[in-house]
Structure formats: C-alpha cells, structure tokens
Design a protein with these regions (language model features):
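A glycine- and charged-residue-rich anion-binding loop/surface
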Residues: 1-396
Length: 396
C-alpha cells in the first residue's frame, strides 16, 4: 500500500483536504472501522502529542466522525464511528480537522519545546518524558531542579514567547545533520525533521507547531514533584494558561470572601487562622486530658470501663483507652459515633484484646487491629450496639 502524504507536516494550519481512500477495514463488533487515505491533514498520535479529531465526508454527504488516528508503516489510518459501503477503496472523501483541538495541541507542544530547550540550556536537563494530556502537559527531566530554578526557567521561556520568533521546520541532509547539535529522545531512521526555535531549542520532532512563539501565548508551570532523580512538571500553555489563571483568581476571590480579606492578603489571613487553630487545638488537647482523667477516676480498679464520647478523633480514642487502663485491669473501650458507625479503641492492661477485636469486626462489619494490649478500628454499628457486644463477649 502506498504511504500517506502528510499535509500537516507541510502546513500545520491547514484544516481541510480532499483525499482518496486507499483501504477500509470494518470492525464487526462495533460497526465502526478504520480508513487509510492517500493524503491527510489529520495528525496521528505520536511523540507525546494526541491524534487529531474531526470528520470525513463522503460524496453522498455522509459524515463520519474521526475518533482516533494512527500511523502504521507509513500509512495513516483514521478510526471512524461508522463504515458504510460508500467508504470503499478509490472513493473520494473530504477531511476536516477540529481546529480548536489542533491549535490547543500546537500551543502545548511548541510551549513544551521552548521550556525543554531552556531547561537544557540552564541546567543541562534532558526531557526524558513528555505527554500532552487533556488538562496539562507532563514533562519529566533527567536532573533535579530547584523551585527557584524553575521560576527562572519559566521567565526565560516566556521571554522567548514575547519575542515572537519564528518556529522553523527543516529537513537537513545526512551531512548537515551530523554537524547539527539538536535534542532527540530516540534514534531516528530515515529523514529527520528538525524544529528550531531561535534562542531556545533545536529538536527532532514530527509534531505540529505554531508559526511563531507568540502564538503560544503564555507558558505556566502549575506544579512540580521529584521523580526518578529529576522532576516531573505539570505545564499549561496558551488558552490553558489563561484558563488556569482565571480559575486561580476565582478561587482566590472565594477564599478572600470567606476570610474577609483582600486578594493580596489571603495568605496573611490564612496564617492568622492557622495560628488560632493551633492554639485551640492545644487547648482542646488539654481539656480532653482533664476529661479523660475524670472518667478514669470514676472507674473501679477491676471493673470494665466502656466510655462513649462524641467528636473524638483516632488519637483521642487511643488516649482515652490508655488512660482507662491506668485505672483498671478490666476491659477498657473508648467509643465515638461516626458518620458510618462507630470508631473504637479496645485495651486491657495485662491482657490480649486481639481475639475480641476480631470477633467485633466479624459481627459488626468492622475493620481494625493492633497489638495484644490495644486495638483500634471502626465498625458499621451504633455505639450502643458496640457496647452491648462488648459486655456480652468481654471474656474473649
């Protein structure tokens, strides 16, 4: 089968084409299929960039939705939602890509080239992983980069955008390629396509790109994390960067309204509330300790002590159970009601509560465990039901 001519490599801004079907293969299970064309504007998935979407229109007016595009041995196959009889080899079709989808991918991909090139210049970082996702671009670097280093690289990358330099596509000869310094993620056979962004990057790439860096709009690093000896970045460009800025501004406005603070004072307000929370938490810790002491003092030395208190977190349950064991050699149980049932902590000073915990979990749909002298968990029963079970089975 003849190879498919790649119109998208000749002009990434071309949105339509008139083509001839080379082959059509049905999918018997779904009724859909795939179509190979002699030439196409549809970019096939590859190099970290998703495939184009759009439509193929047959001469009789039937419109087929293009759901995915892949290249196999130089032939580009278009996965379509239906494969009528008219979609046969030799038939003409009119292709049209989803331009908004394509331009978004162009902005993300060109922005990734700019940032990758800058990171390589500044830190010697290689791009060891790249994918244009539906929400952000994921980039993995080969070396660690500090937050301040990323801030400087982001600024340098955006300066390239502001300069609005041309994005150049070239096909160097073997001799020219041997003398060229360029980035490449893998060994490439055959003709190499070089994407050059003056001042930023020279890279082997088969993807679609903007004509100038200004069309990228903006490059914004949303997040970074240490990953396999380097950093993994979450990046957005163009319209996505604008949407991210608008969303962050809206969230900041919501937070400011809740805190009765101006936008530039939300961090100060949050710190103030955090300090107040820390002080209240310390006070609460002390008051709980006093309450636990009082409950322990009301417990006879050899009696079972089953106490239910609302609002206890796991640490509070543990503290209460331990305090009760200091007052009695009997079974000690701290219980608190939860949305889904009861949180519990069982303890015995000189005994083993694991068998009792296992029985409780089995009987009351619970989960939990621990050491011989103390076990903790939760179950799908009320505190009253748990207390009744413990009184009936406390000899386990």
């Amino acid at each position: 089968m003849q190879r498919t001519e790649k119109y998208f490599e000749q002009d990434a801004f071309r949105t339509e084409c008139e083509s001839v079907i080379l082959a059509a293969e049905p999918d018997e299970k779904t009724g859909a299929g795939r179509i190979a064309l002699d030439g196409t504007v549809f970019y096939p998935e590859g190099g970290g960039q998703p495939a184009d979407r759009g439509t193929l229109t047959l001469p009789d007016g039937t419109v087929l939705r293009v759901l995915d595009v892949h290249e196999q041995a130089g032939v580009i196959w278009h996965t379509v939602d239906a494969l009528p009889a008219a979609a046969a080899p030799g038939a003409a079709v009119a292709g049209c890509i989803d331009w908004d989808w394509r331009f978004d991918k162009m902005q993300q991909h060109t922005g990734e080239h700019i940032l990758s090139g800058i990171l390589h210049q500044m830190f010697g970082a290689e791009n060891v992983g790249f994918h244009v996702g539906t929400e952000a671009v994921r980039m993995d670097t080969s070396v660690p980069i500090s937050p301040e280093g990323l801030r400087q690289a982001e600024l340098a990358a955006n300066r390239i955008v502001w300069q609005d330099v041309p994005v150049l596509i070239s096909y160097p000869t073997r001799e020219e390629l041997a003398a060229l310094v360029y980035r490449s993620k893998k060994e490439i056979e055959g003709q190499v396509r070089i994407v050059t962004i003056p001042g930023a990057d020279v890279c082997a790439c088969c993807g679609t790109h903007t004509r100038t860096t200004g069309q990228v709009g903006q490059i914004k690093i949303l997040a970074s994390e240490n990953y396999k000896g380097g950093v993994r970045l979450s990046v957005v460009c163009g319209a996505r960067a604008l949407a991210a800025a608008q969303a962050m501004r809206a969230r900041q406005a919501d937070i400011g309204a809740l805190l009765s603070a101006k936008a530039d004072q939300t961090a100060v307000a949050v710190h103030r509330i955090y300090d107040e929370y820390t002080a209240l938490k310390f006070t609460h810790f002390g008051l709980c300790g006093q309450l636990f002491d009082a409950l322990a003092q009301l417990t006879a030395p050899d009696a079972d002590a089953i106490r239910t208190l609302p609002g206890l977190d796991p640490d509070g349950l543990h503290r209460l159970a331990v305090r009760l064991t200091e007052a009695t050699t009997g079974l000690c149980a701290a219980l608190t009601p939860t949305e889904k049932g009861t949180g519990y902590c069982l303890a015995r000073r000189d005994g083993d509560v694991r068998a009792l915990t296992k029985a409780l979990n089995a009987a009351l749909n619970g989960r939990g465990g621990g050491k011989p002298g103390i076990c903790q968990g939760s179950c799908a029963a009320t505190p009253e039901q748990v207390e009744r079970f413990l009184k009936e089975n406390n000899k386990l």
